[in-house]
Structures are given as structure tokens and as C-alpha cells.
Amino acid sequence: MYYYELYMPVLLCSLNPDDGVLKLNEVNKKTRSLYWQLNFEWMKMFDLSAGVIPKLFETAKRSSGKVLEIGAYEFIKNGLLKKNVYKDCDKTIGIVNMKVESTNYVSSLKSKPVLSKTRSVALNRILDESDRQKCEVLVLPELSVPFQWIELLATQSQRKKMAIVSGLEYVVNQADEALNIVATFLPIQWAKYKTDCIPVLRLKNHYAPGEKQMIIDNALKCPKSLSHTDSCYDLFHWRNSYFSVYNCFELASIEDRALMKGKVDFLITTEFNRDVLYYSDIVGSLVRDLHCFVIQCNTSQFGDSRIMQPTESILKNMVRVKGGKSEAVLTEIIEISSLRKQQRESVKKYANPKPQKKAKEVEKTIKFKDTPPGFNEYDIMTRENGYDLIDPAD
């Protein structure tokens, strides 16, 4: 039985907790235990070596303040756990240019999600196209996929060996709370011919004022767990890369944006956002402040979906798109290895400044801008070596 097949029933039970406080970050912990009992517990009777299996799905073991590090590790042979099976850290990123219809997520608020064949065909067309373009990470906008199709995304992620990040339409629990959830699906290979997928769902930390009003107007409530002190973000360590996902209005928090400084190679933001100019200013600053690639995916009618890199302004937008009646997948390769190299050289240059070469020679060798003040060299080396960024003792 696949891990993601067990995840869904555990998730549904967790949406209606007895104490009224949602703890989505504990869903993987419960699923791991159940997965182990059903698939590998019997091996103990035959003294078979399977002690490493539980570690494979130990996805929520390190936390520091508001950051939860999630390591989707893989192992290939001889029962050995491998953190760096994939030596190439560069990634092919795909952003989906699609229109998110307000009628769809409003229907979900009324517990009447639109699960039509037309929507299903369109989503599968997007997934097939991203596979043809050999995407390694596919990003969809906020509120773009019905909550009921989580298992479909997990299945496609596992089969196509492609990470998927998507905002899910609202799901209403028994407490009449409207949950805005962003989902991340991480495919893994834990044996030569055995693959699986680890879904990670996170509740939106900061609902936008207009979003709160819409929920109240539909006679619903925002989750009790929403508060600035309780906010938590995932730091994913997957296939020799580090990234995090922010859900639209979360980017408006300066403190929350700063949590990932030096800790990510790229940052993903899913959006359903009308205020394009404001968010354009935010991500334009973010790409330089965090010195990482930024993948922004908004609904097509508002646009400004793009892939950015920390270079001079004229080159920073690698992909940028708005509009269109039909869905489209736009891909670009982000050179994480080159970025890390530049970060390391930039930090050393700050520490030990030396006379520069001629300007023309410098321009040939430098692609990215220098790192901002206070950029941690230890974090750079940790990412290059594939270690955990957050110490368990923190």
C-alpha cells in the first residue's frame, strides 16, 4: 500500500480535532506509523533487515521557532539511507498559467465543490504537458484544485516523479471553519523499482482581510489556530535542493519572509491576488533579500506569474506571463549550483576583500548579484553538502 493512500483518511480525521485546534503537521507522523505497521511490521517475524524503512518517512523531525524542516530522504540499495542520491541540484521548474474561477472556490465554501469532467480533463492535460516538458517541480495557483483531488495529485506526482505544489480550494470542517490549504507533493524512490509520494499539507497562516470577510459573509469562520505567534512554515529538503512555500498574503509579513534567509535555494509562492503591483514590489525585493530563485504563480486573469533570479533587474525575470484563455505550462531551468557557488564567493569576498580584476573580466564570471549583509556562510555550505539545516537541539 502506498504512503499517500494512507495519508488521505488520516488527514480527513485530522480536519475535525477533538480540541478544535488543527495540527496538520502531525498528519505525516500518524501516517508513518500506520504505513510501517501495515507494510513492514511483519518482517520482524522473519528477522529481515527493515530498520531503515521508518526513517524514510521521518518527515517532520526538526523544528526551530516557526520553521519546520521536512526531509524527504530516499535510499536505493542495501537498505542504506541516502540523502544525496540526486547529485544534480539544478531543477526544471514549471508554472501553470490558468484561470482560477471564483465560482469554483465559492462553491467549495458552500460544501458543493465543482468536480466536473471538464475540470478533471483540464487538470490532467496540465499534468501530462508538464511531464512532456520534463518538469521536476510544478507550481499551480492558490485555490486552483479541489480538495477532493488530493489523491489524484499524489498519484500523478508518484508516477511522473514530479513534485507538485498547489493551493487547494476551501474545505469546511465540522466546526464551520473554512480551511485554505497549500499542498506539496514530494515523489521519492525508496528501492530500485519502488516509488511513492509524501504529501505535506499546511494551513494558510495569514488570511487576507478580504478573504476573511468573504468567509464571514458565507456564515463560516476562520480557523482558531490562526495567529501571528502560531504561524509555521515548511522548509523542504528534497533531491539535493532546499525550498519553502508561501501562500499569497503570507508574503505581506516582513518577519515571516525573513525566516528563510540563507536557508532556501528557491521559494515558491502560490497566489490568487488582485494587487499585482504590491506583490510585484514584494517579490522584486524578496529575490535579492533572500538571494534565491523565486517562483510566483498567480491566476491568469491577474497575471504576473513568473520565475525570478537574483541578478540585475533587466535579467531577473526568467519567465513572466499573464492572460490567455487556455491553460499553459511554462518551464525554465534554475541553476542552483551556480547560485550556491556565487553565494560562497560573495560571502568570502565580504570577509576578505581583495583588489578586483578588470571590469570586463569580472562581468564574464559573475552572473548573480552579491549576497545581502548578514548572509550565513554556514547555511551555504550546509546546503551544498546536503545536510539538515535545522539542528534538533535548536
Give, region by region, the residue ranges found by the protein language model.
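Cys-nucleophile CN-hydrolase/nitrilase-fold catalytic domain and related Cys-dependent amidase chemistry
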Residues: 115-202, 273-275, 284, 288
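Active-site-proximal beta-strand elements of phosphoester/diester hydrolases
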Residues: 90-111, 201-203, 241-250, 268-270
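Active-site catalytic loop in hydrolytic enzyme cores
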Residues: 58-86, 176-262, 282
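Extended repeat-based interaction scaffolds and adjacent low-complexity, acidic/S/T/P-biased segments
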Residues: 1-83, 91, 329
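N-terminal active-site segment of His-dependent metallophosphoesterases
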Residues: 77-134
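A short C-terminal boundary segment appended to hydrolase-like catalytic domains
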Residues: 337-394
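CN hydrolase (nitrilase-like) catalytic-core segments centered on the catalytic cysteine
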Residues: 1, 148-166, 251-357, 386
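Structural motif
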Residues: 136-137, 163, 241-243, 266
